[in-house]
Design a protein with these regions (language model features):
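Intrinsically disordered, low-complexity serine/threonine-rich segments
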Residues: 1, 29-30
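Bacterial N-terminal signal peptides that target proteins for export
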Residues: 2-16
Length: 339
């Protein structure tokens, strides 16, 4: 996930503050936030299929199924980031590889580079048009990351200190930087997580960065003041004992006097039915960004690996990979109180 800054403005302008988004009038204290039901995200418009991957040449290296230099007509995507660049264009980056037919083994084979799609110059509402976002050259293939493992998953991008920082997994969590979103320089490893660490996402709040990520059946968070040195992890949420699957693609948002944790459910039973891209995402609320344990969801929202971001007018949007359409789709959302 990523926010939508004006070009290279300080990141503190993007922080989800209490006054920025038309919240409750006056100051909402922590106790009041607990007593009130917080607003929940509601999709209020159509899903528009803004990006469908075009046919492309597989850049390699060879995998069991895909061969370097061969052209494949159909590609699929997964976890992704959306951001507005200094060129006035909206960009999307994410997992990609040639499509795997339903029922074939290893539907995530060769996730070794990222797609890059870009819309024409103009505000997001003008780019909410089917097919408007077009493929650009793939980025960060293994040949450009020779000191890393081949896999590159779930990019998340924020502007910081005059650069765009991209975080990606799976473990070790690594990062790359860019000044323009077109040319990227891999910078290496940030940390490793015993077991697993994937799907990183970063929230900035009160001078502290919070990185949430998936590890097995839990969501973990680490904190940092400079994006380089990270604390030890805190487990902020876990699936109930006995549940199968996982809490994937987590996102933390600071809004409405507290914090939202949103994650996409991977249901192992659905996987047995060959449903690879599942689109049930769950919304949790807490006054403590490090504790969503033993809480019930306050809402469910459609979207696979959903990203939540704002446009130039401060309006909110959600994106989804592969559901309801191949590629990336976006829809407007509103934060509303439950009736």
């Amino acid at each position: 996930m990523c926010f939508a800054p004006s070009p290279m403005k300080p990141f503190h302008l993007l922080v989800f503050t209490l006054c920025a988004f038309g919240l409750f009038s006056g100051i909402v204290g922590a106790a009041d936030s607990v007593n009130r039901a917080p607003p929940v995200p509601i999709i209020v418009g159509d899903w528009v299929h803004v990006y469908r991957p075009a046919a492309d040449i597989f850049p390699g290296p060879d995998s069991p199924r895909f061969k370097t230099g061969e052209r494949y007509p159909d590609w699929q995507v997964n976890d992704h980031a959306i951001i507005q660049g200094p060129d006035g264009r909206w960009h999307a980056f994410g997992i990609t590889h040639p499509a795997v037919a339903k029922g074939e083994p290893n539907p995530h084979e060769a996730e070794w580079f990222l797609f890059h799609a870009a819309a024409p110059v103009g505000p997001l509402k003008q780019q909410w048009v089917a097919g408007r976002w077009l493929d650009q050259p793939k980025i960060l293939p293994p040949a450009e990351r020779r000191k890393e493992i081949r896999e590159i998953h779930s990019p998340f991008i924020i502007p910081h200190d005059g650069q765009y920082w991209m975080f990606y997994g799976y473990s070790p969590i690594r990062y790359a930087t860019s000044t323009d979103l077109w040319s990227w320089q891999p910078r290496g490893e940030l940390f490793r997580q015993e077991g697993s660490a994937r799907d990183p996402s970063v929230m900035h709040h009160d001078g502290l960065f919070y990185m949430s990520y998936t590890s097995r059946q839990s969501v973990l968070v680490r904190t940092s003041r400079d994006l380089l040195h990270w604390s030890e992890p805190t487990t902020v949420f876990s699936l109930a004992p006995g549940e199968t699957g996982g809490a994937e693609s987590p996102t933390l948002l600071a809004l409405h006097g507290g914090f939202y944790l949103i994650w996409c459910r991977w249901d192992a039973e659905l996987s047995k039915q060959l449903v690879t891209y599942q689109d049930r995402s769950f919304v949790y609320f807490s006054t403590d960004p490090l504790n969503f344990r033993d809480r019930a969801p306050i809402a469910e929202i459609q979207g696979h690996a959903p990203e939540f971001f704002q446009d130039e007018d401060g309006d909110w949007w959600i994106s989804s990979a592969e559901r309801p359409f191949r590629g990336v789709s976006i829809a407007p959302i509103k934060w509303k109180n439950k009736s």
